[in-house]
Amino acid sequence: MESCPSVKNILVLDSEGKRVAVKYYSDDWPSLSSKQAFEKSVFAKTQKTSARTEAEIVMFDSYFVVYKFIQDLHFFVTGGDEENELILASVLQGFSEAIDYLLRNKVHRRAALENLDLIFLCLDEVVDGGIVLETDAKAILEKVSGHGLEGSGSLTEQKLSSALATAREHFARSIFS
């Protein structure tokens, strides 16, 4: 199993470095305090960078950390120093794109907390026990939709439903303005 792409953890932190959704897949951080110390250190090292348009990568304590910021959420994927950073970047890209779609392009702390169940479903579809399962955002969304995202409709039906909901919101605003 050494050749299977794997990750050590996936972190979603807010703009203050506080946990929104985290999942660890290795025993490199055996206690809650060591996990929180790692999160704090990674956040401190990356917060002054501008990883808003593309993912950035940093070597941190013999780990590759690939990260990206979307609005007030910071996404991190950590892998060992032997891991391929392009695979880590594709994990981050697929996961963050799936979250962006699920939260309807409103990727911020409040929306993430309100939809924490969907975020953890995405995590489960991307990585299982540290082994990378899926990196394509559409495939992740299809699998999550099979778990009950907006009923049991297909992704196309969900897009249509989302478009109709947005149109209703705009129509209601125009009537009451």
Swiss-Prot record:
<keyword id="KW-0472">Membrane</keyword>
<comment type="subunit">
    <text>Oligomeric complex that consists of at least the alpha, beta, beta', gamma, delta, epsilon and zeta subunits.</text>
</comment>
<keyword id="KW-0931">ER-Golgi transport</keyword>
<keyword id="KW-0968">Cytoplasmic vesicle</keyword>
<dbReference type="GO" id="GO:0030126">
    <property type="term" value="C:COPI vesicle coat"/>
</dbReference>
<keyword id="KW-0963">Cytoplasm</keyword>
<keyword id="KW-0333">Golgi apparatus</keyword>
<dbReference type="GO" id="GO:0006891">
    <property type="term" value="P:intra-Golgi vesicle-mediated transport"/>
</dbReference>
<dbReference type="InterPro" id="IPR022775">
    <property type="entry name" value="AP_mu_sigma_su"/>
</dbReference>
<dbReference type="Pfam" id="PF01217">
    <property type="entry name" value="Clat_adaptor_s"/>
</dbReference>
<dbReference type="GO" id="GO:0000139">
    <property type="term" value="C:Golgi membrane"/>
</dbReference>
<dbReference type="InterPro" id="IPR011012">
    <property type="entry name" value="Longin-like_dom_sf"/>
</dbReference>
<dbReference type="InterPro" id="IPR039652">
    <property type="entry name" value="Coatomer_zeta"/>
</dbReference>
<keyword id="KW-0653">Protein transport</keyword>
<protein>
    <recommendedName>
        <fullName>Coatomer subunit zeta-3</fullName>
    </recommendedName>
</protein>
<dbReference type="GO" id="GO:0006886">
    <property type="term" value="P:intracellular protein transport"/>
</dbReference>
<comment type="function">
    <text>The coatomer is a cytosolic protein complex that binds to dilysine motifs and reversibly associates with Golgi non-clathrin-coated vesicles, which further mediate biosynthetic protein transport from the ER, via the Golgi up to the trans Golgi network. Coatomer complex is required for budding from Golgi membranes, and is essential for the retrograde Golgi-to-ER transport of dilysine-tagged proteins. The zeta subunit may be involved in regulating the coat assembly and, hence, the rate of biosynthetic protein transport due to its association-dissociation properties with the coatomer complex.</text>
</comment>
<keyword id="KW-0813">Transport</keyword>
<dbReference type="GO" id="GO:0006890">
    <property type="term" value="P:retrograde vesicle-mediated transport, Golgi to endoplasmic reticulum"/>
</dbReference>
<comment type="similarity">
    <text>Belongs to the adaptor complexes small subunit family.</text>
</comment>
